[in-house]
Amino acid sequence: MAAQFGNYVDYSGAKAPGSATHVRDPRLQILAATIPQIFANKHILDIGCNAGSVSIQLSLDFHAASVTGVDIDPKLIAQAEKLLALRASRATPPTSCSAPVVDYFPMSAVLTHGYRIEPHNKPARTPSAASAAWPYVTFFSADWVLPSDQDATDSYHVILALSVIKWIHLEHRDVGLTTFFAKCSSSLKPGGYLVIELQTWDSYQKAIRPNHAPHFQETLKELQLRPETSFDSLLANHGLHLCASSDALPRRINVYQKA
């Protein structure tokens, strides 16, 4: 089935065998091992959050101070809200003396007694202030590339763009990708990190197949920027410099730091 924006349900990159929403994402584990404390007590933006698994893990498993997840598809944000309610309902909240214990209550407890923390019924369409209540995760639906009255500078310690750059590039072309990188830079605090999961040019070509996103065929012909050769210099122009990378997974993960 073709996808309008590349936002396949439950798609946020190649999945590890046997992976599930409560199993720590290997990309996050690699990042935490490469740059210790990259997530703990940090304010994080997850762009293209899909159904919310990564955003929620950042809070529950990697102890972020707050996480904001944004996706262009409100249906995926609704799924993310339900997953957040489920995972938060299975955990013990943090106390002044201890961190939360995730997956403490069995699924049967939720099935029998319902959510301890109810999901939001209507996905937000604008970013609100970071949630003041545990688990400190906020979701909203928007095309983050586009300017908004809610945009703020120096807001985040970390911005994640996992398995989403290709779709931003195809949707908004070279000029939109440049705008996206500039907005990432302005949204990061000094010393903050932009994390990109690179999608190679051949994956762009595969994306326009009839059963994927054929409506991007003409757009692809217009693109001059290439992920393998153009991104580092383009990001450097916006004050974001490559500081770490990993080829441990099928897709390279690059980390850029704001000067």
What are these regions (language model features)?
Residues 149-159:
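A short acidic, Gly/Pro-enriched loop at the edge of an enzyme's catalytic core
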Residues 190-198:
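Conserved beta-strand signature within the Rossmann-like core of class I S-adenosyl-L-methionine
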Residues 80-81:
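Conserved SAM-binding loop
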